[in-house]
Design a protein with these regions (language model features):
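Hydrophobic anchor at the beta1->P-loop junction of P-loop NTPases
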Residues: 17
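NTP-dependent small-molecule kinase module
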Residues: 148-255
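Conserved substrate/cofactor phosphate-moiety recognition/catalytic segment
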Residues: 34-73, 99
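A glycine- and Lys/Arg-enriched "phosphate-lid" helix/loop adjacent to the NTP-binding pocket
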Residues: 99-172
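P-loop (Walker A) phosphate-binding loop of NTP-binding proteins
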Residues: 20
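Conserved lysine of the Walker
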Residues: 25
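Extreme N-terminal, non-catalytic leader segments
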Residues: 1-13
């Protein structure tokens, strides 16, 4: 019996991993996918036609870059749900608008017109009842000093050249974003609570927490559905009584 069956996690579940650079999103994605026998969905940056241009000129290409990311993530989300779920997703569609596009706008590297166009498009595409939101978002978090230490340890050249002030700002923006996020259930996991590279068996502890969150979310949906049903039934009863009074008016009093 695998962990998905042991903890009764639906095979159609879609779980997305979020968090700033260096918190271990890819490691978590891989570990959970193997534990649950799910597929993975990773961010594709090699085929992005705007990335190099963007780094040369933020102001000119920030809007194009964000539109490209939105389109690609939307298509990927659609593909995942058309496949029937069963995916662990590295990075969510929500982070681009909630963090990166907003940062460019606030810093002046995306003009107000482009930012408004982008956010309107995002809201029309994603923030609707028709968009297939994930069943759970796992947010990886930890002290900014530990995050910077991880970034330095893995030694990627572009990241090594990035000033520490940027990582501090990004850490703060992520915290502000997740504290106001409500598009799907959230499970917050501290990066110092587990070490999946040294202790891969710890993934079961995370799977157990995922199962609890999914069960709570399912129960909440059922309760909300019942509340809606009873509210709807009361409205229906009131409407029926009103119609009955119109169709069968009370007889006039006789003297």
């Amino acid at each position: 019996m695998n962990l998905r069956e042991k903890y009764n996690i639906p095979s159609s579940s879609v779980i997305t991993i979020a968090g700033t650079v260096g918190v271990g999103k890819s490691t978590m994605t891989k570990a959970l996918a193997e534990a649950l026998n799910f597929r993975t969905s990773y961010e594709k940056v090699d085929t992005n036609p705007y990335l190099d241009k963007f780094y040369d000129d933020f102001e000119k290409w920030s809007f194009h870059l964000q539109i490209y990311f939105l389109a690609e993530r939307f298509k990927e989300q659609k593909r995942i749900f058309e496949y029937g779920g069963g995916f662990i997703q590295d990075r969510s569609i929500y982070e681009d608008t909630g963090i990166f596009a907003r940062m460019h706008y606030e810093k002046g590297t995306m003009n107000p017109t482009d930012y408004e166009t982008y956010t309107n498009l995002f809201n029309a595409m994603v923030m609707t009842p028709y968009f297939p939101h994930p069943d759970l978002l796992i947010y990886l978090e930890g002290p900014v000093e530990d995050v910077i230490g991880r970034i330095q340890e893995r030694g990627r050249e572009m990241e090594q050249q990035t000033p520490h002030d940027y990582w501090y700002e990004m850490h703060g923006r992520y915290e502000d974003w997740i504290n106001n996020f409500n598009s799907c259930p959230v499970l917050r996991i501290g990066i110092n609570d587990y070490d999946l590279l040294k202790n891969p068996e710890q993934v079961e502890l995370i799977v157990e927490r995922i199962a609890q969150m999914l069960e709570q979310s399912s129960l909440k949906e059922k309760i909300e559905g019942l509340n809606y049903f009873y509210r709807d039934r009361e409205k229906y009863s009131e409407l029926s009584n009103e119609i009955a009074r119109v169709i069968r008016p009370e007889p006039a009093a006789t003297f």
